[in-house]
Structure formats: C-alpha cells, structure tokens
C-alpha cells in the first residue's frame, strides 16, 4: 500500500492509495498544463535572475539548500539505517569501515548505484522527491506545475572499496544524438558534505551548447561505443579531444547536504567514487511536464508504480525495470523488488506518479 498524506494538514489527515495490483484512475482525470512560454531554451536573450541563467550558460547548476539541513540530515540517517538493517542486518556498521563489503550490504555497483530491492520506492526516496524546494526548481525550468517524476535509483558510494571493480571515468550524455535540443533536465539531491575527495558528479561545462555540432561531426565515427539504448552516448578519446579543442572544461561539482544538482541531458558527465573518509550519498530526481508523456507512457508508468519498479531517469517511463541484481554471480536472494518501508505520498506526490493524468481506461501492460 502507498499511504498518501496531506503534509499541509494535520498528521491524522491521511488517505490510503493501493499500489499492490491496480491503482484506480480517477473518474475525473486531471488535464496537465503543458510547458509554458518561459520553458528553458524557449526564449532568446532572456535573463531570469536565478539559477536558470547558470543552467543556460553552463549546462549545469547547483541549487543551494533545496532541502533544509534538518530534513536532509534525517534522510541521510534513514539511508544509513536502511543499510544497517538491510535483510534483517547483514553486518554493516556505519562506524566500522571493515564492514563495508558486499556480503554486508545490498548490491551496490562500482559507480555507487543501488538499483534493486524496490529502493526507487523506499520511503526516504519518495520523501526526497516530494520536497517543495526540489519540485520548485523543475517547475521554474519547465514553466508548469504539472510534472511527473522518475522512479530512479539512489547512490550509496563508500570510499576505498576493494570488493568492487574500479570506477573508471565513463563520460557520456543521456540523450539520443539524433534528437537535438533541450529534452530532459537531470537532477540529484546531495545528502552528505561532498568536497574534492568525496567523489561525485563531473560535468563538461558549456558542452551542451556544442552538442549538435559535435554529433554532426561524429555521426559516422568508426569506434562508436555500444549503448543499450539510443538515449545514451559514450564519448571516445577522439570525442574527448574534440571537446578539449573547443575549450570545454571538466568540473567536479562540490555540494553541501540538501543541495540540488541539475544538468542538461546534453551535458557530458560521469561520476567519481569517494577517496577520502566520507561516503557519497544522493538521490536522483528527474521531472518533466506530464503533458509531454503520452497516455501509453502514463499507463506504463502506472504499472511500474504498482509493481514498485524503477524507470531510470526518464519520468515518462521510457525504460522500465533494470539490470539483473547479482550477488556472487547469482540473482540476489534479498532482491524482492519491494521497498522495506511504505512511502507516504501527499496529494502532490501522487500527481508526480502520473496516475491522476491518465485519461483512458486502464489496460493491462
């Protein structure tokens, strides 16, 4: 069950929304307001006087303090507690670095991604997605209040792990080269202090504005990196040299707890693992106008919500599910696909699922 709570009212004002088999679509579905005339990149010569100016120019920005410190500290505590109590407790202790190993934890990739276990629908994941300061930033970018959110993973990267393969740079952009222009704004909420030695997001400053020129020149490159989806492009050594020749600078973004990092999907980026003594935790948050999703998209998204599946960073459920979660080469026995705790959704949070915008009769998907 998903418990929907009106956070603006008393704690007792709750309603329950089923997310076990089928979630009823309202008899009066909402009609989403499309992106407005002030959507990012829709105007020329405009100055916003806020974070959008940096986002336009650089292809990325840090929205400081999107979540108040006391609440983000609570989320950090919940995430650590989740790991310490995972599967009844496998031996991880946040105060003992010797316990940071796969046998004591959920499977976490070398890039810090925790992808299975229904974590896309854990209570702390949904609480972060519903934060007003996070939603507000995307509202401003798209110029509409009617948004849907991705059911994406979280990052729980610990420093100096030797039980996973090295995290080598993987510069890429999450956008089909044949579909140019601004299409998707990616984001993450930073949980712990993130400095120079703490790993994190690396971006190629300003390269989003060169994306069309780059792909026109590299359209027939002979050593193109394989991708499982057209919405991903990996940069080769030749591509990296092209960016360097254009004067593009790679920047490691530092952030404080509660900061929201945003980047245009055309911006080349990758992540680094922490090397100091602090872990890097973040939750990926990506929103798009509900009007940009087709009814078929929304039905796929509804089914993913009901089955507590993930959808990568695309809010329109372009990709549902994920890679197999393997422990010692076998499917992880702890991966039930169900969250440990029931998330609590406010009215706005439930709209972010996309379900209230479904206009047609439900179908089996």
Describe the residue ranges of each PLM region.
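Secondary-structure boundary elements
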Residues: 139-148, 177-181, 190-198, 209-210
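Non-heme Fe(II)/2-oxoglutarate
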Residues: 30, 92, 218-219, 257-262, ...
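Short edge-strand/loop segments of extracellular domains
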Residues: 156-159, 204-212, 286-292
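Short, structured patches in soluble enzyme cores that scaffold and shape functional sites
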Residues: 153, 158, 173, 185, ...
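Active-site rim elements
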Residues: 121-127, 173-175, 238-252, 270-273
